[in-house]
């Protein structure tokens, strides 16, 4: 098929660099004050916009050109020209070699491994490489812990553990002394620390290590300081609540911190050991268990772990489930997942292999599962067509109706509940557990935001509150891919995000600056092309006299934005332009049909003229002279001329059906749009029987029904304040919700006889209708600016 993008852009004066100042202005909605300077002789086209009187620079349009693989001339911003293949290849390699997951070493866990005595009875450590790791990794201030981010809980628990390990073997007394000094000077900071950032089990393991230090004769530690006494008090209160009988029977989170507990029945606990020999993937807990039991499986887990990390031990291992799930999530939200589809498929296959009816944990084959990993896994697998039973979430629903990350959780944190909220939105009909989850999660998160209690116990992320706030304001059905990507590029901190376990830790599969750099580069490249296409769309608007039909430039911008925010890829110009033009041409013809002066004879004449266009032969210039009807037909004819013969034939048939419907007062814009997208994408080329397939017809009928309801709601919204109130009520209509759930089910499930890419077009179109009905006009204006014009920082 000849490239429509090549045809339309080569005809454009913008492409030929003969742009007049009048036709080249990037017209913005009335809410923006716009100024542009575009001269045909300028080498660098400078554009700027003022939003609320604040000057904002805009990605340049007149920039170096590169040629896309389809032959289209693509404008690139200067910063976006740099090669993206290297970061893509780096990320592909990262995903392909994930293995058990990449994670930073924990001094705390390494110290517990270093404390293990030689199994042959010699006077020395069984794992001297772990002791050496401690020696080599003391920080300049005498502490151990995350060097880039200070967290008092992390620094103190790491430092006391390393001090105890060194003293256990009476080595490096000067390092022990420096560590003790650090603890003395910083222990009072515990009184000021954020409770939400307390490392896992700190109140249990820190006192246990102090007792161990005292038994080793380490003097000068602040054993009796008020801060330490407060930790002891919290420990006593927690231990009173620990159901020791239950923890010996079923896997609980307490298996993660056995080294801080007393009076344990090891015969019972060994029955709860994971298949890999660990206790809930924790090297420190497993090291303590080995000290008490000399269990061979514990030993093998510890040895395998330190061999992997050159003597060090992370706070948890493996992290194969956690690493893969969050990597996919980050790549999707950043808008760059399309570069890694085979790798993502492999990652999800790995997750599916270890999925259970209890859910999943951060590491595979764990009997203990949590709501965070389970929610993320359920959502991502469902999005990719896996059959996942949402009733797995019942494992985390308490008797009072609340959901918890895991049983016995003391402080519920925002991030796991936010992932529950996100998962709950991919609901199929009849899935009441997801309705319960959505209601609970929404209320929980709203309350956290209202009370400014958004600090998280699992991750330190600067923009987490912004992310959650936006997620509540913009649910999945009312989110368009490029809008989500633009915001997430703004919020994603890359390596700046730090995770909280027993210690602070980092994971390159999740928090990676290369992800961020690639996302920004890709967005700039796409945005530059979108701006170039917008220039062409404005010229088309002028040359076709579209304004005469009561269609404003803002209407044109909205149509182009909806298309671009949904299908943004560089190579999909054909579909974007066809989407935007089809919406505008349909408005033109509808305007002509609705005029009081338009007779039935005029309507039939237009339909007959369309019939004179033979899709398998050259068009005959129908309708190039005359009034509004002729102008509308000429615009449609010109649109069809941009395609090869067979595509033109298919599109003409789609428009003929739509015009016949319009003549009878029941035009189906959504059907026209989805058919146009699938035709232009080549999904049904030479396979017209797909249009008659039962599944295709079911999708088409359901999408049309949904879009008609949403169009009515949109009309209500435009009637002022009362209309907006009515629209908010209407969009929560039970029938509409159930129809959307059914559409999501039909599109996402792998079952059926038609390609998923064909089905995705129906959901993409329906989501744009939902988006318009859901959001206020000012919000949409903001999104248009961010996606099309605001440069990536």
Swiss-Prot record:
Question: Which residues make up the binding site for substrate?
Answer: 238, 457
What are the required cofactors?
A: Mg(2+)
Alphabetically sorted, this entry's keywords are: Chloroplast, Isomerase, Magnesium, Metal-binding, Plastid, Transit peptide
First and last residues of the transit peptide: 1-59
Which residue ranges does the UniProt annotation give for the motif DXDD motif? 370-373
Q: Which residues are Mg(2+)-binding?
A: 370, 372
Which terms in the GO cellular component ontology are assigned? chloroplast
Miscellaneous comment: Plant silencing CPS1 are impaired in tanshinone biosynthesis in hairy roots. CPS1-silenced plants exhibit an obvious white-color root phenotype compared with wild-type roots, which have the characteristic reddish color associated with tanshinones.
Query: What's in the domain note?
Result: The Asp-Xaa-Asp-Asp (DXDD) motif is important for the catalytic activity, presumably through binding to Mg(2+).
Its name, as the record gives it, is Copalyl diphosphate synthase CPS1, chloroplastic
Q: Which organism is it from?
A: Salvia miltiorrhiza
Q: Which lineage is the organism of this entry classified under, starting from the top rank?
A: Eukaryota, Viridiplantae, Streptophyta, Embryophyta, Tracheophyta
